[in-house]
Every structure is written in C-alpha cells, then in structure tokens.
Amino acid sequence: NVSYDPTRELYTEVNKEFGAYWKSRTGQDINFRQSHGGSGKQARAVIDGLNADVVTLALAADIDAIAEKTTLLPKDWQKKFPHNSTPYTSTIVFLVRKGNPKKIKDWGDLVKPGVEIITPNPKTSGGARWNYLAAWAWAKHQAGGNDAKAQEFVRKIYKQTKVLDSGARGSTTTFAERGIGDVLLAWENEAHLAIREQPGKFEIVTPTLSILAEPP
C-alpha cells in the first residue's frame, strides 16, 4: 500500500483487520508492506516504478497522474467504488502550543507579525495542498474577497512559514518534537495524534472556515 504521510497508524489497523477477514474467507495469509510520504512524491514514485497493489493518496489529482502516465489504473478509477472511490473525509485545523500564546483563532491571525507557521510543501504534500485551498477559500470569502486577494493572502502565509517539510508527518515532527513554529496547519488526525502523544502541550483551534478534504 503506497500511501500519503499521516496514514501509518490508520492503515496498520486497516491492514490487520483486512488480513484477518481475508484469511477467514480464503485461508490465505497476506504480507502487508506500507510506504508513506508526501502524496505528490508518492505518486511520482509509483509512476517511476515503485510497486503498489494499492495506492491511497491525499488528492484525486495524484491518482489521476498515475492513471494518465501509466497503465496501472483506468482513467475512470473514481467510478469503480462508491463516493468517487473516497473511503473517508477529513479537514484542516490549527495546532497551537498550550495556552495559545499567539492568540491564533482564525486564518487572518496567521499573517500577524511574528507568527511562525509550519506547513508542508505543496509541491510534494497532498495535505499541504488542502491547507493551501482552505486558506485561499477563507480569504476569498472575506468582505471584498477575490482571487487576487486570496493569492496575496496565501503568499503571506508562505512568507511566514518557518519550515516546509516534504510531508504532513514531517511537519508534525518539526512542530511537536523539534519545537519549531507557533502554529501547525494540520490534518485533523495529525493534530489529535500530537495531543494524544504529548498531553498538555498543545491545543486544537478550529478556524471559522476550512475545507472538506476527500482523500481517495
């Protein structure tokens, strides 16, 4: 299973359950191998020859690229399963340090002077592209918002980004373990994972507008 960065724990559990189900039906044991990284980077790896029986990436566009550039998937892959072959949805939230010292409540607070942002690189990370789209949507929905203002807002976000890791899990590590940045733009599950692993150190902030992410 070639998957995107923050799904290690999820697919470890899914694989365990599916392995038991498959053996009960067929008597066969399955050997699972997981590969995780930024979604765009993983798509390129499959296109370049990385073996995969299953791909579970962050964006439909990444799987489209595999379908377009290889013979591994049909171009109408989204029609093969219900819900456009999207098994679950998620969203983007902010993870801040305990007490929220920079008073970050919404997207507009991210570009205040002195706020250091952690988000992955949208060139390699699917989660980063969902972050980008959520920020764009918020800016465009403000009074007088338009594409030009949304573009300028997103530019400011990246100007105040301290580290651009290649994937979402790398960004979580940078923020939670290395202690860099004031706010992490995160998948919902990554934010909850950080709080569970380091209780008492972080808080989740839900912005007034986010995005319905549909990883296929």
What residue ranges belong to the model's regions?
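A short secondary-structure junction signal
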Residues: 105-107, 128-133, 196, 216
